[in-house]
From Swiss-Prot:
Top-rank taxon: Bacteria
Residues that, per the record, bind Mg(2+) 2: 232-233
Cellular component, GO, one term: cytosol
The organism's taxonomic lineage, starting at the top: Bacteria, Bacillati, Cyanobacteriota, Cyanophyceae, Synechococcales
Binding site for 5-phospho-alpha-D-ribose 1-diphosphate: 87, 90-91, 95, 97-100, 115-123, 127
Name of the gene this protein is made from: trpD
Residues that, per the record, bind anthranilate 2: 173
Cofactor note: Binds 2 magnesium ions per monomer.
Functional description taken from the UniProt entry: Catalyzes the transfer of the phosphoribosyl group of 5-phosphorylribose-1-pyrophosphate (PRPP) to anthranilate to yield N-(5'-phosphoribosyl)-anthranilate (PRA).
Protein name: Anthranilate phosphoribosyltransferase
Subunit structure: Homodimer.
Binding site for anthranilate 1: 87, 118
Pathways per UniProt: Amino-acid biosynthesis; L-tryptophan biosynthesis; L-tryptophan from chorismate: step 2/5
EC code: 2.4.2.18
Length: 348
């Protein structure tokens, strides 16, 4: 159903006055966006109003559900107990690609990871940028991307290739030049519907709404984390606030590096650089030549993934398992295997 212009005006006014949409209203707004039933001016106004008012978990969950339905999986979903590791971006910290390193490390430790990612949001180099630079074919056919999982235990879903419904909104989002609700929806709409997820947020006010959105979407297990010092992943700079989703319930905790047998380190120890620099860091780190801080921040975040995946029941054990894998260089082997599996020569 498409609402009348007056109805949309009233709803916009509701948002501008601090109101929150019901699940049904948020659903209708997203459906209208995808159907191009709103003018660019109306769409821009709604995006700005949502950004100004702040995030609501019910709205996010409803919008994500619509996007999921609009992006059906073009091949059979694997039944491997999948997990995803990603962040909302927007922390502006210019760290190296931590969540990308975590995906390959977690795979080397026994998790099965379907990483859903894109090009840079705020950092200098996004996950897609660095992986493409290391030779991954980002636009491999969907069946090829999925079929890589049994052997490699990790694959990469380049978001623009999997969400054709969002193509028409891309020019407007780009012209606005600011982060919108769509930046938060990206981590919620992995096309392979992972059973578990570690989701990093750049500000602590996103912890509860993102956890609520995951709960409303039926996520089995998840950890939503805001990194000490302002990262959108667990940090070594101090205790990290988290929301843990398990069996339909969300609980709040704090997890410090010391809890996992790791040492605190400043954010400067995690700095990245340009594309070439970040590629070098990722290759050295995954092949056993990373610095202590690089190894330990990846181990910290990998521990969360291993718990979500059910591979480890204890965060500390998970961190130590990740450190052992990194020291052996086995995560780099996973990346090499995935690069070969996604090669154009492998396309059928």
């Amino acid at each position: 159903m498409v609402s009348s212009p007056m109805s949309w005006s009233k709803r916009l006014d509701h948002l501008l006055n601090g109101g929150v949409f019901s699940h049904a209203e948020a659903t209708e707004l997203m459906e209208a966006w995808l159907a191009e039933a709103l003018t660019p001016v109306q769409t821009g106004a709604f995006l700005a109003a949502l950004r100004s008012r702040g995030v609501d978990g019910t709205e996010l969950g409803a919008m994500a559900a619509v996007l999921r339905q609009a992006s059906p999986l073009p091949c059979e979903r694997p039944t491997l107990g999948l997990v995803d590791t990603c962040g909302t971006g927007g922390d502006g910290a210019d760290t190296f690609n931590i969540s990308t390193a975590v995906a390959f490390t977690a795979a080397a430790c026994g998790a099965t990871v379907a990483k859903h990612g894109n090009r840079s949001a705020s950092g200098k180099v996004g996950s897609a940028d660095v992986l493409e630079g290391l030779g991954l074919h980002l636009k491999a056919p969907a069946a090829q991307v999925v079929s890589a999982l049994p052997a490699t235990r990790v694959t990469f879903l380049f978001a623009p290739a999997w969400h054709p419904a969002l193509v028409n909104l891309a020019p407007l989002r780009k012209s606005l030049g600011v982060r919108t609700v769509f930046n938060l929806l990206g981590p919620l709409v992995n096309p392979l519907r992972p059973d578990g997820q570690v989701l990093g947020v750049a500000t602590d006010d996103l912890l509860d709404p993102m956890a609520e959105a995951l709960r409303s979407l039926g996520q089995d297990r998840a950890v939503v984390v805001h990194g000490s010092g302002g990262l959108d992943e667990a940090s070594l700079a101090g205790p990290n606030p988290v929301r843990i989703l398990e069996k339909g319930q969300v609980r709040s905790e704090w997890i410090a590096p010391e809890d996992l047998g790791l040492q605190q380190a400043p954010l400067d120890a995690l700095r990245g650089g340009d594309l070439v620099r970040n590629q070098t860091i990722l290759e050295e780190l995954l092949s056993g030549r990373g610095s202590q801080a690089q190894n330990e921040v990846v181990a910290f975040n990998t521990a969360l993934v291993l718990w979500v995946a059910g591979v480890e029941s204890d965060f500390k054990q998970g961190a130590q398992k990740a450190l052992a894998a990194l020291s052996q260089g086995s995560p780099w082997s996973r990346l090499e295997q995935l690069r070969a599996a996604l090669s154009p020569a492998k396309e059928e």
